[in-house]
Amino acid sequence: VLSIAEVRDAALARVERPEQAEKFVAELGWHDYWRRVQAALGDRIRTAIEPPARDWRQASRLEHVPADVLEARTGMACVDAFVTTLHATGWLHNHERMWLASWLVHVRGVHWLAGADWFLEHLLDGDPAANHLSWQWVAGTFAAKPYLFNRENLETFTSGRHCRPCPLLGRCDVEGSYEALDARIFVAGGPARPPLRLRPAADWAAPTGNGPSRRPLVWLTLDSAAAGSPALAAHPLAPRLFVIDPRWLAAERPTLKRLVFLVECLADVPGVEIVVGDPATTVPAWAAARGCDSVAVADSPCPAVRAAAAAIGTRLPLTVVAWPAFCDASRVDDLGRFSRYWQRVSRSALRPTVPTAGG
C-alpha cells in the first residue's frame, strides 16, 4: 500500500518530462483533494454539500439500492456486469464506478448516500472521502453539474463488450444523445445556487500532551494500515497496534473480502498486534501495558480517528505524523471546486518528493 506521493513519484520516474504524467497525477490530485474536503467537513460529507445542481423529473429518491440491482438482474448488460464484478472482487475501474453511480442516481432515482454506502461495503480500497464525495460529484450535490453518460460513451471505452450482447441494445436507459438524456432526466434549467466556498481545515499534524517521549506506541488506523505508514517510518522500532472498532463495523458493514484485504495489508507490518475495542480507551491501556509513554499516529482526515486521538491525547502525549507531501497546499484557500484547488497545487504536484536520478 503506497501513499499518493509515492504513486506520483513512481509515475514521474517513468516519463521523460513531468507533463507526460500530468493527467495521471491530476487523478491522484482528486484523492488528495477529497481528503482535504473530508478534513474540512468531517461527517458532513454524508449530507449534501450543496443543493442538487439540477432538479430531477423523478423528484423522490430511493433510500436503498433496489433488489434487481443487488442481484445483477436489471437486464442492462453493463450494469449487471459491474455489480457482479464489484461483489465478486471488491473492485471496479474508475469509469465503471462513475457509470454505475450515474445510472443509479439519475436513472433509477437512488439517493446518492444509499449508493455510496453500498459501494463502501464492498470496495477493497473503500475510502469514505473519495467514495462519498465522488458520489456527490456524480449526483451534482458537490459539483457544478451532475455527471451523465450515454451508450456511445460506454461503448467507446469498453470496446462494445457490454453493448453488443445486451438484450436492450438500441433501447436501453442510456440510449441517445446527452441532450436527449438531459431532457428525459432533468427539469429544464437549474436552481439558483450561491457560489460554494469551502475553507480548508487547519493542519492537524501537531503534537499534543506534555513531556518527553522515550518509548512511543504506533497506532495504525484504517488509512495507515500498512508498512508504509509515516508513523512507522518515524518510529521503526516502536510497538505497533491496530484497533478494530465495532462502531466502524456497524457503520460501514465491510464485506468479508474487504476485511481480508485489511488483514492482508496489516500482515505486511512486522509485529503488529490487532485487537477489537474503542481506540480512545484501548490505545492508552495497551500502551500502558507495554510500557509506552506516548502515541504516534499518521495524519488522517477521518473524524473518528481525530475524535479518538483527542481523547487519547488527554491521557498520553500524542504526535500526528504527516504523510509525504503530495503538493504544496499553502496557497489553497478554497476547496469549493477541484479546479480551484488544482490551479493552486498542480505545479508542485508535478514535482517528485525525492528528485529522480539526474533530475
Positions of predicted regions on the chain:
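Trp/Phe/Arg-rich N-terminal binding region typifying the photolyase-homology
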Residues: 1-26, 30, 40-53, 84-88, ...
